[in-house]
């Protein structure tokens, strides 16, 4: 029995580590890919179902539902049920599952997948809640069906908690470790708070884009975006609230800016977008879309309050006939940004000076 328990824990922990290690080796970026997590946890569930825990030669406990808890938490109902279907099918064909057992397994996965993504607690606590839900379902089935016995469920309770606690702590700790490694390796390029490029990467990219625009006879545009009254957010609410606002503004910018262009956080509450081969009209329209999008959005603070914000945007633009230089386009955009601030904020300004 103890050998089987140790095997189940070891396989789960090893699978979690392998998931993070392979993903980091592949792209040097730590992100939760639902497909990647599904493949991992499906394989772990199959390995666990191959070595169930025997209890005094009377009961056999399958812990293959534990990886499904992770899918319920980190993916959605579709991936959770898909994984359970694969595990159930394989065990019906070459394992010890009956069709009824497989169907019960899939139903539990559906319930877990429907609840897991909406739990507000921490990851570790959420996984324990999902484990309790699964155990309650097993307990109910032991009372109303012949497929489970209540004694079997009583043995399952402590073993499942040992496995879920161990594996969830491992999952979160390894995630944090590789995230810190990734942050360290990319600190010269990436703004950790927003995930956008930082000011060093902005300078490099603007210089390179200016050079290529000059060589290819393309126009060069630069948007400097500043959050109006951001200091008041920090002073009235907290710096934590200010950080939350910066992250939400960064996400909003990603939604509006075409994928071929890069977005940067220059520091503080200022963002920048480098554009090329765009007309002045296109640059202004993009700026106005961003300004209007921020104005119409609501921003959620950690204390559950909701606030409204606005941005001022300065547009720097060099035509195909202008000499493209990093310093020149930045100065134009910076001057226009200050003009927008002086004109009452929540403005888009560009040269020739026109206020929208």
Curated annotation (Swiss-Prot):
Membrane topology according to the record: Multi-pass membrane protein
Keywords: Cell membrane, Membrane, Transmembrane, Transmembrane helix
Coiled coil regions, renumbered to chain: none
Gene Ontology terms: cellular component: plasma membrane
Chain ranges of the GGDEF domain: 218-353
GO biological process, one term: cell wall organization
GO molecular function terms attached to this record: diguanylate cyclase activity; phosphorelay sensor kinase activity
Pfam family, one: GGDEF
Transmembrane segments: 2-22, 36-56, 77-97, 99-119, 124-144, 154-174
Record's subcellular location: Cell membrane
SUPFAM superfamilies: Nucleotide cyclase (SSF55073)
NCBIfam families, A to Z: GGDEF (TIGR00254)
Name of the protein this chain belongs to: Uncharacterized membrane protein SSP1970
Species the sequence originates in: Staphylococcus saprophyticus subsp. saprophyticus (strain ATCC 15305 / DSM 20229 / NCIMB 8711 / NCTC 7292 / S-41)
């Amino acid at each position: 029995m103890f050998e089987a328990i140790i095997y189940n824990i070891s396989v789960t922990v090893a699978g979690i580590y392998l998931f993070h290690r392979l993903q980091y080796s592949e792209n040097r970026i730590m992100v939760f890919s639902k497909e990647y997590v599904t493949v991992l946890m499906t394989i772990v569930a199959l390995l666990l179902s191959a070595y169930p825990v025997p209890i005094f030669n009377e009961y056999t406990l399958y812990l293959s539902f534990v990886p499904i808890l992770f899918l319920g938490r980190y993916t959605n109902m579709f991936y959770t049920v898909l994984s359970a279907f694969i595990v159930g099918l394989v065990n019906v064909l070459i394992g010890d599952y009956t069709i009824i057992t497989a169907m019960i397994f899939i139903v539990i996965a559906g319930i877990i997948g429907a609840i897991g993504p909406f739990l507000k607690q921490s990851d570790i606590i959420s996984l324990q809640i999902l484990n309790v839900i699964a155990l309650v379902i097993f307990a109910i089935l032991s009372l109303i069906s012949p497929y489970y016995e209540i004694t079997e469920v009583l043995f399952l309770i402590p073993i499942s908690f040992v496995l879920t606690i161990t594996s969830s702590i491992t999952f979160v700790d390894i995630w944090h470790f590789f995230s810190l490694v990734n942050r360290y390796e990319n600190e010269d390029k990436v703004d950790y708070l927003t995930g956008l490029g930082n000011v060093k990467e902005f300078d490099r990219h603007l210089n390179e884009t200016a050079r290529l625009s000059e060589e290819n006879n393309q126009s060069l545009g630069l948007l400097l975006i500043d959050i109006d009254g951001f200091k008041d957010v920090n002073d009235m609410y907290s710096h934590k609230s200010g950080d939350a606002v910066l992250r939400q503004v960064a996400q909003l910018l990603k939604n509006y800016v075409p994928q071929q262009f890069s977005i940067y956080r220059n520091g503080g509450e200022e963002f920048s977008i480098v554009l090329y081969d765009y007309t002045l009209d296109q640059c202004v329209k993009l700026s106005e879309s961003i300004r209007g999008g921020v104005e119409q959005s609501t921003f959620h603070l950690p204390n559950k309050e909701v606030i409204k914000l606005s941005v001022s945007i300065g547009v720097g633009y060099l035509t195909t006939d202008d000499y493209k230089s990093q310093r020149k386009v930045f100065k134009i955009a910076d001057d226009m940004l200050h003009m927008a601030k002086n004109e009452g904020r929540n403005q888009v300004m560009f040269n020739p000076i026109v206020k929208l």
